[in-house]
Amino acid sequence: MAQAVVPAMQCRVGVKAAAGRVWSAGRTRTGRGGASPGFKVMAVSTGSTGVVPRLEQLLNMDTTPYTDKVIAEYIWVGGSGIDIRSKSRTISKPVEDPSELPKWNYDGSSTGQAPGEDSEVILYPQAIFKDPFRGGNNVLVICDTYTPQGEPLPTNKRHRAAQIFSDPKVGEQVPWFGIEQEYTLLQKDVNWPLGWPVGGFPGPQGPYYCAVGADKSFGRDISDAHYKACLYAGINISGTNGEVMPGQWEYQVGPSVGIEAGDHIWISRYILERITEQAGVVLTLDPKPIQGDWNGAGCHTNYSTKTMREDGGFEEIKRAILNLSLRHDLHISAYGEGNERRLTGKHETASIGTFSWGVANRGCSIRVGRDTEAKGKGYLEDRRPASNMDPYIVTGLLAETTILWQPSLEAEALAAKKLALKV
């Protein structure tokens, strides 16, 4: 099979996907005025000539030498609360801040967000990232959604999170988040995990976590392409690894401050959807894609405040754990659809109906690292969120519950006794 040639390509990842096709990734050359090169993931049909077809040449064309206009990809969360939608528009010149971009609209009746007789939904640009697919000065734009009257849609969870993070009490605490996004790759036409025999199962879990080798690691090229594309886009991605279940991967974003955490997770999910789309692989964030003795998929959220990170911060961590225990049901109800299939008390999870915490215990609701305990300061890990959670909801709730919400003294005392917390 011929290898596709990409002009001035500085890096390449190749995956054999099917006969007559080569999957490759590369960086295009720098454009006019020092415009950033673009990271490309391509499905290239190669015939006897081995020449990149004209369609691919057009897709990879750098327009910066020819025009100041740029393409802005407006991205928003759809009606299900987990689906990602986007559409493109031309902007007259490069932009550096979302305030430079116009509001836009779309047909909300086609996304389950508005009735047909009053279907217009307004997009408010909120954050911009470099576009790793188009390169140059083109941008990806995180938007939230409003009615024409300026009211946030019920699916606009960013609006409430922004209110929480703009509260002076929250701002003083400079909340940090490190989010571990797990996901599963599926074979397109059979909806079965990548690398698994169709209609069958691989060997038991054990050899696959952080593994290498064609018989143990499935989808590394997608994970690597996503990693590099996120770095290019300006996402604060901090790592990636193969997960316990074969065909499942994880990447980490953070530490991020406040609302930035949600923006970075949503844009990273969008980029991952685009890469899997081009690779002909299905991405699922289902928290338990395969029933049985297989790990589910979570979105563990590491969290700290300024007080937790300072000397003596472990006492503040314990106080936060106490508050979280008192609002366990509220958090569980907002931590992702289908999470009851994952939080069973098995496969490194706590039982969904019982709040628990522990040091270095991955079977607890809240885990505290040994390093945090030893230093007397640090962070906590909320292990309850599902892989399909909304990061705006989870980060906002963590800040609200641990900084703004005040339990009654009686409830606090009872919870402290139950959890053996001396606060």
UniProtKB/Swiss-Prot annotation:
> Could you tell me what reaction this enzyme catalyses?
L-glutamate + NH4(+) + ATP = L-glutamine + ADP + phosphate + H(+)
Give the highest taxon in the source lineage: Eukaryota
Keyword Cell division annotated: no
Q: Which coarse location class applies to the principal site listed for this UniProt protein?
A: plastid
Domain (GS catalytic): residue spans on this chain: 154-423
**Per its UniProt record, what InterPro entries does this chain match?**
Gln_synt_N (IPR008147), Gln_synt_N_sf (IPR036651), Gln_synth/guanido_kin_cat_dom (IPR014746), Gln_synth_cat_dom (IPR008146), Gln_synth_gly_rich_site (IPR027303), Gln_synth_N_conserv_site (IPR027302), Glutamine_Synthetase (IPR050292)
In this protein, which residues make up the domain named GS beta-grasp?
70-150
Q: How does it assemble?
A: Homooctamer.
Name-wise, this protein is Glutamine synthetase, chloroplastic
